[in-house]
Each structure stands twice: as structure tokens, then as C-alpha cells.
Amino acid sequence: IGFATAEALSEAGATVVITDMDAHAAEVALEKLRAKGRSGSAHHLDVTDPRAVERVHSDIINQHGRVDVLVNNAGIAISFVPAEKMDDATWLKVLDVNLNGVFWCCRTFGQSMLEQGGGAIVNVGSMSADIVNYPQEQAQYNASKAAVHHLTRSLAAEWAERNVRVNAVAPTYI
């Protein structure tokens, strides 16, 4: 989903910034875009670290001047773990990436969009926000994506009058 989105945005003329927990993967994705004559940059980013989000945001602003569109696509799923057997670390890891990471990015990039007079944020949720994909026992994933959808609605309501649109997409289970 992430690379296809980056590719579509770059084909529409956007300068694309690719972030990934795996710095090499971000560079490889950027090189694929550059091979098609597109421009952009790649950055290592752990979305679970709010200070890292702030540092990367600062680097992007210094390099590109502004951010008009943010797509929050980082996410993980750990399936087939019954809720009654799920350890705390699994629950927290999924919520940290899927929900906290989205919030840290929305807060940081959203603030600069508010200051510059507008922007658009797209959060990648899931159909699992609204239905349970049983037999995939993944209470933590479903809860995290439902929270992303509600966070999106909350931010959309808060920021709409200040010209920052916040929406979510809900892809099928991949």
C-alpha cells in the first residue's frame, strides 16, 4: 500500500518523502521512483518514538520547505493470538505502531500544516476497524485500527475550519 501510494503521488507531480523503520527499504523504494524520473527523499523513522517523528519532520521541512500531504501507512498485525493468551508486549507493540505512531505523526505534521494554512492527512486504517475478521484472532489489531478511525474523525472535526483535511481509508485484509 505504501509504495503504491508513493508512486501514485509522485506520478501526480508530488515530491515524495518515504519513511520506513528499515532505512534500506526506504532507499530502495526511493530509487524505484527515481528510476522513473521522480524526486524525493528517504528517511529512517520509528513512528513509535515521538522525538524521532519530530526530528524527521524537521529534516523534511529543512530539505523540502513544507509538507502538504501526509499518508500514515505504518502498521503491523500479529494474528492468531487469542485474546486470553496475548501477552502485554504483543498488545502494546501493535497499539504503539498502529495507533500511537499515527497520532505522533498527525500531531507533528498537522501542527505545521495548521501553521502553513492547510494540508491533507490520510490515515491508513482497515476494514478491521468495523468488522471482526474471524478466524484471525487479532483483538489488538482490530482495536488499534478502530481507534485510528475514531482519531481520524476527531482530528478532522478539530482541524477542518483551519483547512487541514484528515481522512482515513479502510483497505481490505491483506
Task: Describe each model-derived feature in a short phrase.
Residues 1-17:
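Canonical Rossmann dinucleotide-binding motif of NAD(H)/NADP(H)-dependent dehydrogenases/reductases
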Residues 106, 144, 152:
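Active-site helix of classical SDR
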